[in-house]
Amino acid sequence: NEIAITKNVSEGLNLFAASLPWEAGDNVLVCPELEHPNNIYLWFNLARSKGIEVRTIPADEGRMPVAAMGNALDERTRVVTMPSISFAPGFLTDVKSLALAAKQVGALTLVDAAQSIGAIDTNVRDLGIDALAVATQKCLLSLYGFGFLYVRREVAESLVPIHVARYGIDLGEAHETAFAEDELKYQPGALRFDLGNYNYLGATAAATALDLLAGWGMKNVEAHVCGLASKLATGLLELGLPVAGGSPGSHLAHIVSVGESGGGRHYSADDPAMNSLYDHFVAAGIKLSIRSGVLRLSIGVYNQSADIEHVIAAARTWIETKGH
């Protein structure tokens, strides 16, 4: 009962944020440079409707600014939000440290885990977070239109859902059409956020994918994808390409980005060389994206060493033919 069914990450983030008892002057901490836009819009919408303050903290050379966020906390901070892995350049966030800092002032932590669940072994209790949203179309190997919202039971019990439907109401033994005007009892925990009807096709795909991931073991999955990412980052660096974050380290998960973060459009970079490399990769049959000015190569559990070698070989060919 700590998990609600959603359509996507955006719905999960909004359901949680809009259900908090905001007062004018409360604040939320966010690092816009590292967030997907959908974990930015909702806070400015609440600033407009509830009078809250959105405290934007600059990134620390592409990394989550843990120390700066800690310094920005005060007694009016209600939420610290963060990606488990940034939208771009795809670095790991020290979620546990931020959650611990937030607790010191009584603030809640909300995590956008779109880029990590299904690739990185995750234990929400070990992290000490209060809420986490994820969708199934990325590392959970499933479909668009299905997702999960985790809310720690003690937190969920204090929230009044902004949207209510019969799936989120505790009817006990009564028929689903039963309604008593003086009684509105929410389902326990995060179940109060369920709206229904569910995306049953998405649920079927997610159930199968979760069984597969559990069978492989998430520690094994993480070791596999992160090992391949390390090999890719090292190989591209040896070719002289500007790999975000430099040599593999604690920042690296399963995403390797090439180029300089910032600027660019959703499907193009400011640097013509990066656009050229992107086109070369696509022509070589390599699937990747451009986000915030960098080429983002995301490694899945299905990838193998041969895939990494293919990317490195394609990059080498591009350098030789384009003279970069």
Residue ranges, per PLM feature:
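Pyridoxal 5′-phosphate
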Residues: 1-324
